[in-house]
């Protein structure tokens, strides 16, 4: 059993009003490079990518954005957006999600929505359903047949005001959420904005294209099942976390 030591917050369930703060990425580097059409993939600094089964806020995740030449580039960023104008980097803990309904107007997100979209690489996520006054049951949600998808994301960069210009900047991302579809609604009142492969270019395109993609993913193209409560501990990082359990 492999456990990952993390400085992420100990989140035992999920954030109120947001999607639950956990997702998975089982893609190997070769699969990711082929799927996202990454150029020169085998000399990339994150080509040693390993499968992850319990991404949590404030941890590093892989996103794909457009580089200076308009080519897709994968980048490791911290989950939890820190706007470039923020006084410190603590804001990220409360900004793992951005509501699709207000993302174009909110000061923390509107600049990123206009100019810094990204695809958050994932192949599944966890949500917690209330089953009693104090008890929640985790579920794993994914696309049927493991059809490729990405979360709609935004990214930004931050550097302390007193830091020298040559100090590396902190790059962070957030995941957009929207109203739940029929599959997700009994489990949670929000769901991530999920982009099928045909929508990736649009999300990385114009603002109008992004606005047209702020919708719930079709329930009939998804599936879910209950999983064990070990996923509630961010240090647990083993493959059996996504296995179905009886309830």
Task: Identify the function of each model-found stretch.
Residues 2-247:
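Short linear sequence motif anchored by a di-proline
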């Amino acid at each position: 059993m492999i456990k990952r030591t993390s400085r992420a917050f100990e989140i035992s369930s999920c954030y109120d009003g947001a999607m639950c703060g956990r997702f998975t990425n089982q893609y190997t580097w070769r699969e990711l490079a082929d799927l996202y059409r990454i150029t020169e993939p085998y000399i990339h600094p994150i080509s040693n990518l390993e499968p992850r089964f319990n991404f949590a806020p404030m941890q590093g995740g892989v996103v794909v954005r457009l580089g200076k030449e308009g080519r897709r580039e994968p980048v490791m960023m911290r989950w939890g957006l820190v706007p470039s104008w923020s006084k410190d980097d603590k804001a990220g803990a409360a900004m793992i999600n951005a509501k699709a309904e207000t993302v174009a107007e909110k000061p923390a997100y509107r600049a990123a929505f206009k100019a810094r979209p990204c695809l958050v690489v994932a192949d599944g996520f966890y949500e917690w359903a209330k089953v009693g006054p104090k008890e929640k049951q985790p579920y794993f949600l994914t696309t049927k047949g493991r059809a490729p998808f990405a979360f709609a994301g935004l990214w930004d960069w931050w550097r302390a005001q007193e830091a020298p210009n040559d100090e590396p900047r902190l790059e962070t991302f957030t995941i957009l959420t929207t109203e739940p579809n029929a599959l997700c609604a009994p489990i949670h009142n929000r769901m991530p904005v999920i982009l099928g492969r045909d929508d990736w270019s649009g999300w990385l395109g114009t603002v109008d294209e992004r606005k047209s993609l702020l919708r719930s993913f079709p329930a009939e193209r998804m599936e879910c099942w209950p999983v064990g409560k070990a996923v509630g501990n961010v240090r647990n990082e083993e493959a059996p976390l996504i296995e179905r359990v009886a309830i």
